[in-house]
Amino acid sequence: MSPAVADDAGVSSVPLQTTATTPSVNQNWRLLRDESAQLRIADVLQRKEQFRPLAKRSFIFPASPQAVWLQVQLPAQKVPSWLWIFAPRVQYLDYYLVQDGQLVRDQHTGESRPFQERPLPSRSYLFSLPVDGKPMTLYVRMTSNHPLMAWFDPVSYTHLRAHET
């Protein structure tokens, strides 16, 4: 069964297609569809109630001009950790880290931006999380004229080292 995004101002109903192989989520991942693709982080921070829960750490949408926003609240990190996102063919990917209601970090990348702006020289994106004893909320905005597929997960240094080749 696919979760659905409820109908709100600027957000329309759509069944979310998720992958069956992704384990169930223990973080509070939520999604907002911005049909206008015009919302900025300041707008999104005012619309937190319009985000809808995701059952999996992945989604697939057909090609469209809309933007998709992810939101997740994470506890304070005790060890070096990163947000890993695999989103092939995402044209624009914007990452925002908010702590205590303040924007702490933003990074803009994606296939339509210069390759040097990518956190890694691959289709995977890796964003460091602060180890400062404070909980955080992450927001990720994605757009693409291609089908939009994304898999995402917070990962630890140990996890990254275990997957090095």
Go through each PLM region and give its residues.
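Early extracytoplasmic/domain-onset interaction patches
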Residues: 7-128
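Extended, hydrophilic extramembrane loops/domains of integral membrane proteins
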Residues: 134-155
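Short tyrosine-centred short linear motifs in exposed loops/low-complexity segments
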Residues: 78-80, 133-136
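Conserved small/polar residues in nucleotide/adenosyl-binding loops
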Residues: 158-165
